[in-house]
């Protein structure tokens, strides 16, 4: 499936003492459980409503952990839910890191206690969470026949790894449980298992594993209402949390399970976004009604997520159909449209939810913590990197030939993420079509160092694919070359599927490679040279500054930026094509021009007052572009007011239909009159409607006066790009990059409903617009 479906269920089991020794938040001797009839959670004998917000320490810079917890508490919440990502703690079999940087989840939990917040712990082993492989370690995929999320009888190797994981983290979890003076109210068993299977033996083995490690619960599970009812994927003595759970869903669950407590375990204030989608998802979600119902009924809930954070590095996940088709990779930002933005600021809905929750008796609203300052550098102050090193001049030794006869995925070589290079000399070459049966996930192809084109597993809009010669099929025509050219296929793994039955999603080339129409080379290719390229922090730290082939893509660009002071910022990569960025050695994550994300979050603690290094690896670009520093992920929504009529650029009748012609209308405060302006480094902008997520577009890319200006999904075309030309007093003309004509009102009319068209510039006031940020 392309998206994680809305599910419904989570189990919480009875009783445990609640206290935090040495913490200002709690005292010893507290008890937590639920009422005998399962209708309520109970703390110290009194009904207790869990008002939780989810955030993940792995996605938040450590210096900001306390700030984000305080933001959740100031919204009226009393609990933090968090995933523990197994693969982030154990990247190699048996080698655990529970203390370095964002991996120290126990320190995060202790901060929750210090801030007076309880905790719902969600340690998997599978978590989904739009995280690579749903948190399962990629080393599991080295076994060809691996079966994931099954009991020990079905795959003892999988379950043995789970046992090792639980035994490693249980000593950390145990003292933080309520019964032992910690803030953890409940521990979740697995995650949304009802959408994957119905193996009760597996769930019980997990429960017994925790019990055997001294963690006695309470436990809970998380599922969709339909799934938990159909597949009975709750656990003995546990409660049920419902994905997308409304007040009525909780009542329905308790009808199906009369003596089991239920809560809204994942209530979605936004949604996830994939590369290539027209706009950030979930921006218009309003949970006010659902929250009011839950508060009125004193039912427990968890906002997934109250703060999303960032998929730094290569940790973002993906979605795909069960057979692996329809693959879509998640963007780097995990802003999610959450009440607390990626950079920790209150989103527009934050204040509304805070006021709603705070209006109920017994809810206190602490003041918001101070926001982190931001810094910007634009125009001539924006850094412009210089070519620094070539990936091709920094190749490691090839892997042993015995292991590389046929192309194999990176997991077979113990590599978790990054890139793989597959190299083959082609004796007797006379032209051919390359057929790479299964690229996971994005390949650039070279013949004797000359770029031939690309192969992408994710769909790429034609406006981006055509100039780069990127195909989403498997076949790529190769050009002419000498009689023994070297074929290089560089493959980027973009994130493993994290939901559904297609979890076994290996990276690199996963099947055969062949040539057709090539005489003696016709057929399957073997005897490859293979290079493992994790391109991680250690790799970039050891780069040799050498570029022996300046015209060959795969260049690292470097800039040094001197800052008088630090602050949060976003690196605007809209002038670049596809790659990754490091700042002072920290991997900010992937960027890709197909969007919708164009800016990468750089937290202030990763910058220094003084000199800072920006390093960019771009898979296609040979000429560097400026990298402006911006204050936010996206521009603040704006309105466009026509100078002659005083009316606003408007999508009529709140239409979401592609092709709807725009008009002008009196201001109504609606999202159909609000636009997100994304401005590239060269001053060219696009305008995306906040309501529909579609862009201002010249119909059919026609250049005739009077051509309708419509809304249309993002396609990268120049007919969706506009130059802003100031005309004085804050007004500007919007000039089409494609046609050179301007955005105007048909007939220079001033009436509501007058159509928006392209026109030759006449200087009329109806061709001028005031762009005002909200």
Region roles according to the model:
Residues 5-25:
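N-terminal export signals
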Residues 26-79:
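N-terminal carbohydrate-binding accessory modules
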Residues 67-74, 81-130:
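Aromatic-lined substrate-binding rim segments of carbohydrate-active enzymes
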Residues 94-100, 125-150, 317-329:
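Aromatic- and acidic-residue-enriched segments that line the glycan-binding/catalytic groove
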Residues 161-229:
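Active-site neighborhood of glycoside hydrolase catalytic domains
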Residues 245-331, 337:
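Catalytic-core region of carbohydrate-active enzymes that cleave or remodel glycosidic bonds
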Residues 432-449, 487, 561-584, 591-592, ...:
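Aromatic-lined ligand-binding clefts that engage carbohydrates, nucleic acids, or primary amines
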Residues 635-774:
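Lectin-like carbohydrate-binding module/patch detector with strong preference for beta-trefoil
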């Amino acid at each position: 499936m392309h998206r994680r479906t809305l599910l419904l269920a989570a189990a919480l089991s009875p009783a445990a003492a609640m206290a935090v020794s040495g913490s200002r938040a709690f005292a010893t001797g507290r008890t937590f459980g639920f009422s005998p009839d399962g209708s309520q959670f109970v703390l110290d004998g009194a009904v207790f409503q869990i008002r939780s917000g989810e955030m993940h320490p792995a996605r938040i810079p450590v210096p900001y952990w306390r700030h984000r917890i305080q933001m959740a508490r100031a919204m009226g919440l009393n609990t933090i839910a968090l995933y523990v990502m197994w693969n982030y703690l154990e990247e190699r079999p048996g080698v655990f890191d529970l203390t370095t940087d964002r991996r120290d989840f126990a320190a995060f939990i202790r901060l929750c206690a210090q801030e007076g917040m309880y905790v719902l712990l969600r340690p998997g082993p599978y978590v989904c969470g739009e995280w690579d492989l749903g948190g399962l370690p990629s080393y599991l995929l080295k076994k060809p026949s691996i079966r994931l999320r099954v009991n020990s009888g079905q795959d003892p190797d999988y379950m043995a790894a789970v046992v090792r994981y639980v035994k490693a983290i249980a000593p950390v979890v145990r003292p933080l449980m309520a019964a032992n003076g910690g803030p953890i109210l409940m521990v979740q068993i697995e995650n949304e298992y009802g959408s994957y299977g119905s193996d009760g033996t597996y769930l019980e083995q997990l429960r017994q594993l925790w019990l055997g490690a001294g963690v006695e619960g309470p436990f809970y599970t998380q599922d969709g209402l339909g799934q938990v009812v159909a597949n009975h994927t709750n656990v003995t003595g546990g409660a049920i949390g419902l994905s997308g759970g409304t007040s009525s869903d909780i009542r329905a669950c308790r009808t199906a399970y009369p003596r089991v407590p239920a809560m809204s375990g994942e209530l979605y204030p936004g949604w996830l976004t994939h590369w290539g989608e027209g706009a950030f998802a979930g921006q218009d979600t309003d949970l006010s009604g659902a929250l009011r119902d839950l508060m009125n009924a004193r039912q427990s809930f968890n906002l997934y997520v109250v703060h999303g954070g960032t998929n730094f590095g290569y940790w973002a996940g993906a979605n795909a159909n069960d057979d692996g088709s329809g693959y879509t990779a998640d963007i780097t930002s995990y802003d999610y449209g959450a009440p607390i933005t990626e950079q920790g600021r209150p989103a527009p809905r934050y204040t509304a939810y805070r006021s709603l929750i705070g209006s109920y008796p017994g809810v206190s609203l602490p003041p918001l913590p101070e926001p982190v300052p931001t810094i910007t550098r634009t125009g001539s102050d924006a850094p412009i990197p210089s070519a620094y090193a070539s990936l091709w001049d920094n190749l490691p030794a090839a892997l042993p030939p015995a292991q590389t006869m046929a192309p194999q995925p990176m997991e077979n070589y113990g590599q978790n993420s990054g890139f793989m290079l597959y190299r083959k000399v082609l004796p007797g070459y006379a032209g051919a079509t390359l057929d790479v049966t299964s690229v996971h996930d994005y390949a650039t192809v070279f013949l004797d160092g000359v770029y031939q084109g690309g192969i992408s597993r994710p769909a790429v809009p034609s406006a981006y694919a055509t100039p780069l010669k990127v195909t989403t099929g498997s076949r790529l025509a190769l050009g002419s070359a000498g009689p023994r050219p070297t074929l290089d296929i560089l493959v980027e793994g973009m994130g493993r599927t994290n939901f559904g039955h297609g979890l076994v999603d290996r990276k690199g080339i996963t099947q055969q490679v062949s040539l057709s129409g090539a005489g003696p080379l016709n057929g399957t290719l073997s005897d490859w040279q293979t290079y493992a390229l994790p391109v991680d922090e250690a790799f970039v730290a050891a780069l040799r500054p050498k570029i022996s082939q300046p015209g060959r893509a795969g260049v690292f660009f470097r800039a040094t930026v001197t800052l008088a002071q630090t602050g949060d910022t976003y690196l605007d990569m809209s002038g670049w094509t596809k790659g990754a960025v490091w700042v002072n050695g920290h991997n900010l994550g992937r960027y890709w021009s197909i969007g919708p994300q164009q800016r990468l979050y750089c937290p202030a603690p990763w910058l220094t007052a003084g000199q800072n290094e920006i390093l960019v690896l771009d898979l296609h670009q040979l000429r560097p572009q400026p990298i402006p520093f911006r204050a936010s992920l996206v521009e603040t929504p704006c309105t466009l007011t026509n100078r002659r009529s005083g009316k606003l650029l408007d999508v009529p009748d709140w239409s979401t239909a592609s092709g709807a012609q725009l008009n002008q209308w009196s201001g109504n405060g609606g999202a159909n009159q609000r636009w997100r302006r994304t401005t590239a480094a060269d001053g060219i902008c696009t305008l995306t409607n906040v309501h529909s997520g579609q862009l201002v577009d010249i119909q059919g890319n026609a250049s005739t006066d009077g051509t309708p200006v419509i809304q249309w999904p993002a396609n990268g075309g120049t007919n969706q790009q506009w130059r802003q030309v100031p005309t004085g007093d804050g007004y500007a003309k919007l000039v089409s990059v494609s046609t050179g004509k301007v955005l105007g009102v048909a007939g220079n009319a001033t009436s509501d409903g007058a159509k928006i068209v392209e026109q030759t510039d006449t200087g009329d006031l109806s061709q001028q617009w005031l762009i005002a940020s909200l």
